[in-house]
């Protein structure tokens, strides 16, 4: 059984036992988290009906908080000596999917 969930503006295909890396979620490692925005569930049959999907929940556990790769930004203006360097690392959360409730 798998589900497609939406969190942090992105969609993820998850199954029980998977570890996914999503945009930072509030909570400490070990805390339970519910991913309620379920877009599709495929088990015995494929479910895409919004009324049935409203009953489905994907539960998980926060495994760790990490950072993404370093992104370097360099701004430059010609003939003025203007250089601006900046870096960014996106905070991420690793979530271990513990279950997909069918809502039946």
Swiss-Prot record:
Q: Which UniProt keywords apply?
A: Ribonucleoprotein, Ribosomal protein, RNA-binding, rRNA-binding
* GO cellular component terms given for this protein: cytoplasm; ribonucleoprotein complex; ribosome
Q: Which domain of life is it from?
A: Bacteria
- What GO molecular function annotation could you give as one example from this UniProt entry? rRNA binding
Q: Name one GO biological process term.
A: translation
Q: Does the keyword RNA-binding apply?
A: yes
Family named by the database record: Belongs to the bacterial ribosomal protein bL21 family.
Give the function comment from the record.
Answer: This protein binds to 23S rRNA in the presence of protein L20.
Q: What assembly does the database describe for this protein?
A: Part of the 50S ribosomal subunit. Contacts protein L20.
Q: Specify the protein name.
A: Large ribosomal subunit protein bL21
